[in-house]
UniProtKB/Swiss-Prot annotation:
Induction: Up-regulated during flagellar assembly.
Organism placement in taxonomy: Eukaryota, Viridiplantae, Chlorophyta, core chlorophytes, Chlorophyceae
A GO CC term assigned to this protein in UniProt: motile cilium
Function, as annotated: Cilium- and flagellum-specific protein that plays a role in axonemal structure organization and motility. Involved in the control of flagellar beating in an asymmetric and planar waveform. Stabilizes outer doublet microtubules (DMTs) of the axoneme and may work as a scaffold for intratubular proteins, such as tektin and PACRG, to produce the beak structures in DMT1, 5 and 6. Not essential for flagellar assembly.
Subcellular location: Cytoplasm, Cytoskeleton, Flagellum axoneme; Cytoplasm, Cytoskeleton, Flagellum basal body
Disruption phenotype: Exhibit erratic movements with cells continuously turning around the body axis. Display longer and sharp kinks flagella. Flagella beat in a uncoordinated and deformed non-planar manner. Lost beak-like strucure projections in B-tubules of the outer doublet microtubules (DMTs) 1, 5 and 6.
PANTHER family: ORF PROTEIN
Native source species: Chlamydomonas reinhardtii
Predominant subcellular localization, coarse grouping: cytoplasm
Name of the featured protein: Cilia- and flagella-associated protein 20
Family the UniProt entry places it in: Belongs to the CFAP20 family.
Gene: CFAP20
Domain of life: Eukaryota
């Protein structure tokens, strides 16, 4: 999808405020919902993914299972709200051995397991809004001893609220981020 696009800085694949936030995503829902709502904490539109079973309610990008993202930027950033329920996300990458590897992070696992094609790992979320920064290059090297080439697919499972999902060429400090990539919490009146 993005293979022939110039990639530097930031590349957003989901923005909850956009007119069609799931335009390049496919949705799977079983005993749950995927809808845009207004989050009370940030007083803004977010995408809520809720489901009885984490594995059967999710969004995946790209929507076409025969296509790949082709994103070479090595940092994946998710701005996610912890709903204090089971939650996971998955990223499929291509390495320099031409092998497709998956990384799955979840808040219900306690140990990291590395198998030939999938690495599952625990993730701890703070209460409320979180910015998850995932160094794909580093994880590929540490788990498999190979080099990251590109991201093929991203999948986000229930249960969470999403503000934005983007890729970047490096980690940026809060001051360096463009305003639309920051999560602003409204000022509380006392």
């Amino acid at each position: 999808m993005f293979k022939n696009a110039f990639q530097s800085g930031f590349l957003s694949v989901l923005y909850s405020i956009g007119s069609k936030p799931l335009e390049i995503w496919d949705k799977q829902v079983s005993n749950g919902h995927i809808k845009r709502i207004t989050d009370a904490d940030i007083q803004s539109s977010v995408l809520e993914i809720m489901g009885q079973n984490v594995s059967t309610t999710y969004i995946t990008c790209p929507a076409d299972p025969n296509k790949t993202l082709g994103i070479k930027l090595p940092f994946l950033v998710l701005i996610i709200k912890n709903l204090n329920k089971y939650f996971s996300f998955e990223v499929q990458v291509l390495d320099d051995k031409n092998v497709r590897r998956r990384f799955r992070a979840s808040n219900y696992q306690s140990t990291t397991r590395v198998k030939p094609f999938i690495c599952t790992m625990p993730m701890r979320l703070d209460s409320g809004w979180n910015q998850i920064q995932f160094n794909l290059s580093d994880f590929t090297r540490r788990a498999y001893g190979t080099n990251y080439i590109e991201t093929l697919r991203v999948q986000v499972h229930a249960n969470c609220r999403i503000r934005r999902i983007y890729f970047s060429d490096r980690l940026y400090s809060e001051e360096e981020l463009p305003a639309e990539f920051k999560l602003f919490l409204p000022i509380q009146k006392s």
